[in-house]
Amino acid sequence: MFKQYSLFDISCEQASVSNFIKTVLEEGADLAVSVSGGKDSDAMLRFLSTQHRENDWQGDLLALFCDLGRIEWLGVSDHLCRLCTELDVPLSKLYPTRSMIEEWQRRHETLLAKQQDKPFWSSASARYCTKHEKVQPSDKFLRQYDFVVCAIGLRAEESSARAKKPRYQVRNDIASVWYKTPVTCKSAEEKEVWAEQAYQQWLDSGRKGRFALTWHPIHHWSLKDVWQENGTSCGDVARRVRLYQAGDIERAIADFPCHWAYVSGNTRLSCSLCVLGSGHDILNGALHNPWTWAELALMEITSGWSFQQGHWLADLSVGVLEVSLAQQRTLKEVLQSLQLLESPAPVFVLALLLICPVEQLLFWTLESVQAIASLIQEMQPSPT
């Protein structure tokens, strides 16, 4: 007979750390916190670092960041390094086999070789970007632990699909076969109950094999809760956005506890151009990451498949053409002056000059991106 924890205890429903998870962590489970540089994972890491210290949990606490390459927002890695240093939490950076853009390119080439006329971009129904670029590298890393909890910053408020997620469940891809959640467990409640039973089974076996959980500690948090844990508020973020839009970039960004992309107007921070992003965030991402926009828009033009169904990045070419070179340079100078972005080391620049052809280096200037934007505009098919 498996021991049952207080799954339906009302006080437990309101707590970020349920009685079951508390028990697991008190028994020495290592805690790996998945971070992206976004506000939710920032808040989760801040909260859990405090909980880990105050509860004297004996397992290791660490942060995991899966770097997706040049599609990341400028300064994400710098931000996470500062945050983890501030919280005294070790940060492990993981890298997928291919960066996100390289994965799209490979899939496009594979479909061409097979003469299959299919979209190659990831989408809501084909989220291989999450599976291949984040989950698989994380699982590979986590297999070094025999008893581990991986915390992920999903919130129910974000979507109906996320609202249906369990607070915790067995991490099937790395847990030993005896503890994997059966396919018959469909609901969040069933998956949570199974996790509790599987944990007791693991204890009864003398801790045989690997026991691993996925946990959503801020599942019930509101946006207000997230900003508050990060040391700011919805009102302060709105004030900073107004300053940024008025051109007062330094005052807008200075002392902001999260990544500057929120101050620039983004509502979420994922990839700088995300297939699941809103129209607003796509436009803002393109304006602030014109190099990435140019590369992806050219992939659209040459492949014939739009980045999002019915929405082309190439259609934003007029907006990207209007990007002010002065504003882009000012932004980078501000980020560097506030120590939010490291300047490339001179030795790195010299090495780049030695190994890269001049024509490749020229691509990464803002002037060349504007020229490419003009070309993309000309290549767009005329509306019928």
Locations of regions flagged by a protein language model:
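Nucleotide-activated chemistry modules centered on ATP-dependent adenylation/adenylyltransferase
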Residues: M1-S34, K39-T384
